[in-house]
Regions:
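Catalytic-core regions of glycoside hydrolase
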Residues: 6-164
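Catalytic cores of secreted or luminal carbohydrate-active enzymes
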Residues: 141-195
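Extracellular/luminal regions of secreted and cell-surface proteins that mediate adhesion/ECM remodeling
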Residues: 178-319
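General "foldedness" signal
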Residues: 16-21, 52, 61, 173, ...
């Protein structure tokens, strides 16, 4: 499956700067034409746009310190068309500056951000000349740490470990990789689930569930391509491991969940014609486009999951 499409691709290295136009007045019309084309033809895969202060500009040296006044409005026009964000120069403090940080902060928890490091530490880049003064020749691990810190500040959902020396140096800094696995992106956890342990067939039941996002990013369930497809769900599983009934909480919204801020919901469900017997209660984050099967991995112990991804949380006897 495709995680995302880099849905612009023009400019030097495809990073939306150092453009060449026959007529400079075509900058915005060209940008609008391309973003319209992608948004109309790719409706299920997330689309990403590089965010920076010289978007689509004919910058002679690639970058300029002064932000172009068109950049913010152009980026926000793409976001309105369903785009999310990426940046290719994390760790390059001469490029990823206050303008970029402020734009990321403005759109945190509204659209996801994807990180790619800028310094190619194993090739021609002299990363030790970075304006921050934090990097030393022969120590690419310093670059990796700065990329991680900048990513956490931007609440990124994904980190691109790239290829070659970048991949090797990330593995030599496994503490950073493990830190992102634990805390990066979104990490959705059901911290409390309350349910009846006995019921009569046909009874109306009250279910309460509390969720927390343990990651610094957010679940982008709100982006146009996902369109709120993922929802918390309960299931009753019989003794043979078969799901006999599911209940989806359409009012619960994973894109609202933030690190350190648990959110609780209460829903009433109809037990219906579930036969008498003992069942296992289970929860998941269901994919409502695929018959409510578990759709997103949860931040839970894998040993507590069924083969198809339901988290077992308790028992109920139906009389």
């Amino acid at each position: 499956e495709v995680d995302f499409i880099d849905a612009y691709g023009l400019g030097k290295w495809g990073e939306a700067h150092s453009m060449k136009y026959i007529d400079g007045k075509d900058k915005i019309p060209v940008y609008d034409w391309i973003t319209d084309l992608y948004s109309k033809n790719f409706t299920n895969v997330p689309l990403l746009m590089n965010y920076h202060r010289v978007l689509a500009e004919e910058t002679v040296n690639g970058w300029e310190d002064e932000p172009n006044p068109d950049s913010e409005g152009m980026l926000e026009s793409a976001i309105r068309k369903g785009y999310s964000l990426r940046h290719d120069a994390f760790g390059m403090t001469g490029y990823y500056k206050e303008w970029e940080k402020a734009f990321a902060a403005k759109w945190n928890f509204k659209v996801p951000i994807v990180l790619e490091g800028g310094w190619i530490t194993g090739a021609h880049h002299r990363y030790w000349i970075d304006p921050s003064g934090k990097y030393h020749e022969g120590h690419p691990e310093e670059v990796r740490r700065a990329e991680m810190e900048a990513g956490e500040e931007a609440h990124v959902n994904m980190m691109d470990f790239r290829v070659g020396n970048e991949t090797e140096t990330w593995f030599r800094n496994m503490d950073l990789v493990e830190r992102f696995i634990r805390h990066g992106g979104y990490r959705l956890c059901p911290v409390q689930v309350m349910f009846p342990k006995e019921a009569e067939s046909g009874e109306t039941l009250t279910l309460t569930h509390t969720w927390e996002n343990l990651g610094w990013g957010y679940c982008p369930n709100n982006i146009r391509q996902w369109n709120f497809r993922y929802k918390p769900s309960f299931a009753l599983i019989d003794g043979n491991g078969k799901v006999v009934k599911t209940f989806v909480d359409q009012k619960a919204e994973p894109s609202d969940w933030r690190q350190g801020k648990p959110v609780s919901y209460t829903m009433e469900v109809e037990l219906g014609d579930v036969p008498s017997g003992t069942y296992t209660w289970a929860v998941s984050i269901a994919d409502t486009r695929k018959n409510d099967v578990p759709g997103l991995n949860m931040a839970v112990d894998a040993a507590s999951l069924t083969a198809d991804g339901w988290l077992k949380v308790g028992k109920i006897t139906v009389k």
